[in-house]
Amino acid sequence: HPAMLARTIATLDHILQGRLTINIISSDMPGEHASSEARYQRSREVIEILKQAWTQDFIDFKGEFYDLKLDTTDPIKPYQQNGGPLLYFGGYSAPGKDLCAQFCDVYLMWPDTEENLRGHMEDVSQRAAAYGRKVDFGLRIHLIVRETETEAKAAAQKLISKLDDVLGTEIRNRAQDAKTLGVALQAETREKSDAEGYVEPRVWTEIGRARSGCGAALVGDPDQIYAKIL
């Protein structure tokens, strides 16, 4: 229930004294197989209710999924009084990007080429500007760092040296997000990689053979990783 969720998050924010951030995941409910549009609409409504709860003394909301009119003598105020904890969001479809641009604070991405990451950032920035907002960006990626590039590459190869591709495929397909657009894009990136699994210098995609979701790692020595992140 969004109102109870708002109170739970506010309580955690007080316990953590403002160090709390929230990652919004637009997943199916148990036993449900909703379209991405429906899941994003539900997320949109939940976020709007959270923001009302954290910034007002009442909740007055009517949408497709929720119809709430709640007055409270016990305001749901988080520790962070700038609108509540920062909201992180990841999604590659147009509705997902638009939701993030309108309501969230940080757009999260999975590994990709620098060119493609730049394209996503420009797209979301333009969408946010249309709402009079700015959005920050985050990247989830694994790191394999050793004293030398040779050692780092050897460590990467060791991770998958005993991987059975059939089992890896089964592991990926069992994940709840296995059929999402984001996971499909990770597979496309992996297919574009060279014989060693690098889609561009330092970006190694072979780790995605054994897991769903974030399917690549930065591989190199400390200076190389630092330079790539910059």
Kindly label every feature range from the protein language model:
Residues S36-G83, D112-L230:
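An alpha-helical appendage that flanks or caps ligand/catalytic pockets
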